[in-house]
Amino acid sequence: MKSNFKWIVLMVITPFFSNGQLPYLFRDTSIAVFHGSNRLQNPWASGMNTTNFAEIDLNGDNKMDLLEFDAPSFRVNPFINLGQANVSSYVYAPEYRSKFPTDMEGWVRTFDYDFDGDMDLFSYNGGGISMYRNDFSTGTGLLFTLITSSIQTHYGGFQTNIYVSRVNAPALSDLDNDGDMDILAFSISGSWVEHHESFAMDSTGNPSSMKFHYIPVCWGYFVLAGNRNSAILPPVLPTCPLVAANPYRAYFDQERGIVDEEVGQLNNSNKSMRHAGSSLVVYDNDGDGDKDVLNGDILGSNLLFLENCGTPDSAWICAQDTTFPSYDTPAYMLDVAAPHYFDVNNDGNKDLIVGNFFPAGEDYNNVIFYKNTTNNQSNIFNRQTDRWLVDGMIEVGTGAHPVFFDVDQDGKLDLLIGNDFYFDTSNAIAKVAYYRNTSLGSKAEYTLITNDYSTLSSYLLTGIYLTFGDVDGDGDSDMIIGHSDGSLIYFQNLAGAGNPCIFVLSQVNYQSIDVGDNAVPQLFDVNRDGKLDLLIGERTGVLNYYENMGSTVSPIFSFVSNNFGGVNVAKVGSVAGFSTPILFEKQGNYELLVGSFSGYIYHFSNIDGNLSGTFTLLDSMFQNIFEPRLATPAMADIDGDTAFDLVVGSLSGGVVLYTQDQTLSINSEQDESIFFNLYPNPVQMSLNLSFEKESTTRKLIEIVDVTGRLVYKLQSNRQQITLDVSKWTPGTYLCRVSDSKRTFTQKFIKY
C-alpha cells in the first residue's frame, strides 16, 4: 500500500471537524510509554534542561510536592509526591501550572516566611526579589498573592531593594534561629555574600512583617576566587565591606585594596573577582546549629561546600570541599551546578539534588540524586542516579521535534522525535528517537526502539526536523530532513511499498534549497495538482513555499515565496520565530497550524485559491496551548478514537500530549459553563470539581472506573463540589459531566 505522509494527514484530520467547529483538546498524561519493559512514570512531562527545584504542597495533603522551574522557557512543571515511604515517586500534575504566577524569571525559591505552614514563593524581578504569599485553602486550593515585587532592606540610613541578579540565586533561611527568614545573596560584584538579616520578630513579633537590614560584612568572611569555584578563606582575604566588628579587619581596605603582603598579589583592584552566575543553598550539614553552604558557580563545573565553624549569629567559613561530595562521586555540571536540599524519597532525611542552573549545560544526564544515607544532623550523600525524574520522561536532550509516521508499515502511526542536539562535555550532535506504536486494540501505547533512528548521528547534524512523502514515485515514503543551517537532506527509501522503511542518504543540500537557518519542512500538495510541494518553516518565523514544477517521479522544487500567506509567528521586536508548519484539510478546505518559539500555536484559514495572498489568522493561541519555548506540534489520531490529537515538542527536550474529547466541540457561541477542573490529580483523599462559570442549569456528574462501572452519580448546579474518595480503589477514573446538549470528560488517578 502506498504510504505517503500527506495522505496520512488528510486521512487523520478530515473527519474531525464536523459542523465547522473546532475540537476541544485537553492535556493528557495517561497514554503509556515504555523503555524496554519499564513504563515511564511521566512520559508527557515536557522534559527538563535547566532545572530549578523547590518544595511546595500543591494539593493540601501535608506532603511536600515538587515544583520545577525552567527559567529560559518561563515554564513551571508541578509534580505530586505520592508519599510512599523510602520511595522517590512523583507524578506530573500539569493542572497546577495555571496556579503559579506567570511573571516569574531567573530562579525560584520557596520558604515559609510567615511560618503558617505553607511554603511561599520567591523569584527574580528586575534586580530584586518578588514574593508571593501562599494563601492555600480548601475552597481555593493553591493560591498565590503578590506581597511585594521588590523586597526592601535597610542599608544604614536609607532603604532600597535587596539586589539579586537574574543569574545569582539567593539562599533563604532562618540563619540565626530567631523565627524569621533571613536572606543571603551575592553582592553586585558576585564575589562575596551579603547578609540581609530579618528583624521582624525583634521589632513586631510577627515574621511576616518583612523587615530586613543589611549586615555590612562578608557573611562567613569568605569570598569566591576570581577564576574558579572555590573560596578564599580567612586570614587570606581580598577586598570586602568593612565594619569595626569584623575580626579580619586587618586584611580589608576598601580604598586601597589588599594591604597585607601575603595576599597583595591576589587582588589589588578587585576586578578579577567579578562574575555572575551562582546558585546558593545553605543548610546545617553537621548538626552544630549554624548553616553551611553549597554553591554552584559559573567559575567552575564543580559543587563547592563551605563549612561554617562559627555560630548562628556569627558565621565563619573555615574549610571547603571543592569537589563535593569528595567522599563519594563528586557532582559535576558542565555549566553551573544547581544544588537543592530536600527529602526526595520520603524517609525523613533530606537528600541532595544537583541540576543545571544555566541552559548551556548537559541536557540528558542532568539531574543528579544523592541519597542521604544518615540523617539531617550528619548528612552523608550517596550518588544514586544522574537522571533523577527525567528518566521517567520522553527526553531527547535539547529541542524535541516530533512527527508521526508508520516506520514499520504495520498500519499504525509511530512517533519519531528529532532534536536540536544532545550536549555533553564536548559534543552537540542531533539524533532521532523512534517510539514504535505498540498499541493493542484501542489501548494506545508507545515503546522506545532506539534513540538514534537510522544512525543519523553519524552525519553530525544539528537541528533535525523530519518530513515524509513519496518523492520518487516508487510507492513508499522517502524522508527529507530539515537542518539547522537552513538546508535539506534527502534520504531515499529502498524498502518498497508496504515494507519497513530502509532509508539511504541520497543528496545533501537537497536541490540547493536554503532558507537561512533552522529549516522545518513539510511535504504536502499545496496547490492541489497531485504533486508533493515543500512548505518550509525557519528561524525568522515566516514560511517558504517551493512548488513542485517537476513530476511525482522526478520533482523539481522551485522557489515561489519566502512570505507564504503573510505568516510570521515571531513576536513583535523578535527575530526568533521558529515556524513549524502543519498544513491539513478540513471539510475540503486547507487550514494551517504553525508552531512558534513563543510556545503558542497559530491557526490560519483562507488558503485555497489564495496561495499568493494573505491567509486569515483565526487564532494566535490555538486551543490555549502554551508550551514554551519552541512549540513544535505534530498531529495524528494516536488513541484510535477517530479524532485528531497533538503532540507538542519544546526546547527542553520533551513532549506533551493533547487529546480530543469527541463529545465536546468549541466555538465562539458556546456556553462554557460545563467546563470544569479536577484537582488534585492524582488524588488520595478529597477530589475537588470546580466549574469555570456559574450556571443555574443542573448538570449530571458521573464517575466511572476503567471497566465502565458507575461509582458516583450526582445532579447539581453548584460551582464547587468536593468528593471524599479516600476509600475508593486506587486506579484510573473518568469524570463525566453532561447537560442537555453536551458531555465533557476528564481522567483522574486515585492512589
Question: What function would you assign to each model-found segment?
Answer:
Residues 11-19:
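Hydrophobic h-region of N-terminal signal peptides that target proteins for export
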Residues 3-10:
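Sec-dependent signal peptide recognition
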Residues 21-666:
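Beta-propeller-forming repeat regions
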Residues 12, 669-751:
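C-terminal outer-membrane/trafficking sorting elements
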Residues 16, 298, 582, 681-683:
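Hydrophobic residues in alpha-helical membrane-spanning segments
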